[in-house]
UniProtKB/Swiss-Prot annotation:
The modification Phosphoserine is found at S53, S57. Gene3D superfamilies: HIV-1 VPU cytoplasmic domain (1.10.195.10). This is Protein Vpu. Phosphorylated by host CK2. This phosphorylation is necessary for interaction with human BTRC and degradation of CD4. The lineage of its organism: Viruses, Riboviria, Pararnavirae, Artverviricota, Revtraviricetes. Its main location: host cell. Residues 53-63 have a biased composition (Acidic residues). It comes from Human immunodeficiency virus type 1 group M subtype B (isolate YU-2).
Length: 81
């Protein structure tokens, strides 16, 4: 009976560790999805303003650049194909 209790405790600890790892991965992916939605909204806002006024919004581009942690980024201009 003693070994069965030890086995149950070990199984519970392993299950807890697996649950923590899985929920950590889920949380990281959720944050990525939220960040991508924010980037998509900024891109849409930049393109709408560019269509309306003939030029792009510098503030939105700076915010988008800060989100993707790169320099000037224009994802709609793809010349690397």
């Amino acid at each position: 009976m003693q070994s069965l209790q030890v086995l149950a405790i070990v199984a519970l600890v392993v299950a807890t560790i697996i649950a923590i790892v899985v929920w950590t991965i889920v949380f990281i992916e959720y944050r990525k999805i939220l960040r991508q939605r924010k980037i998509d909204r900024l891109i849409n806002r930049i393109t709408e303003r560019a269509e309306d006024s003939g030029n792009e919004s510098d503030g939105d581009q700076e915010e988008l650049s800060a989100l993707v942690e790169r320099g000037h980024l224009a994802p709609w201009d793809v010349d690397d194909l």
